[in-house]
Amino acid sequence: MSDKPASMYRDIDKPAYTRREYITGIPGSKIAQHKMGRKQKDADDYPVQISLIVEETVQLRHGSLEASRLSANRHLIKELGEEGDYKMTLRKFPHQVLRENKQATGAGADRVSDGMRAAFGKIVGTAARVQAGEQLFTAYCNVEDAEHVKEAFRRAYNKITPSCRIKVERGEELLIA
């Protein structure tokens, strides 16, 4: 069965449901890694720091976080090479557990379905709660690679729901000159 539309889980309208020690059957996170690029190099070694900042308070499902991470990282690998001199971090982790009260449809569904009886729902996935103004991705790079990082972030925010902006946190004076 396919996933429900992200609009069902986008708004933060329920209390946090994150206590994994009490919840069984949580599917694994689709996010393969949170740190990409040259992991052994320190972030302070790079002159430019660029972040993707979310402008709305939303929940982002782990599938969309992985899709945006993959899109950005693939672009950077393609442009800067497999051993490219950059470091990128996904800053959010999907702690929020999502539930869904499945409904039967079609002929005879009224006899099979329980309706709203025992409507707590089954676990279907996880999501990250992101507040407005928080950083979703941060990349550290050299001055000549900054445009590639901005393009990678543009591709990343096309994969997620909220509007985002790309902000140069450090080294803006180097990019203007």
Curated annotation (Swiss-Prot):
Q: What keywords sit in the KW lines?
A: Ribonucleoprotein, Ribosomal protein, RNA-binding, rRNA-binding, tRNA-binding
| Molecular function via GO | rRNA binding; structural constituent of ribosome; tRNA binding
Question: Is Hydrolase included in the keywords of this UniProt record?
Answer: no
Q: Which SUPFAM superfamilies match?
A: Ribosomal protein L16p/L10e
GO CC annotations? ribonucleoprotein complex; ribosome
GO biological-process terms attached to the record: translation
Q: Which CDD domains match?
A: Ribosomal_L16_L10e
Keyword Transport listed? The answer is no
InterPro entries attached to this UniProt entry: Ribosomal_uL16 (IPR047873), Ribosomal_uL16_arc (IPR022981), Ribosomal_uL16_CS_euk_arc (IPR018255), Ribosomal_uL16_dom (IPR016180), Ribosomal_uL16_euk_arch (IPR001197), Ribosomal_uL16_sf (IPR036920)
Q: What does this protein do?
A: This is 1 of 5 proteins that mediate the attachment of the 5S rRNA onto the large ribosomal subunit, stabilizing the orientation of adjacent RNA domains. Modeling places the A and P site tRNAs in close proximity to this protein.
Into which family does the record put it? Belongs to the universal ribosomal protein uL16 family.
Q: How does it assemble?
A: Part of the 50S ribosomal subunit. Weakly binds 5S rRNA. Probably binds the A and P site tRNAs.
Q: Enumerate the HAMAP family for this protein.
A: Ribosomal_uL16_arch (MF_00448)
Entry protein name: Large ribosomal subunit protein uL16
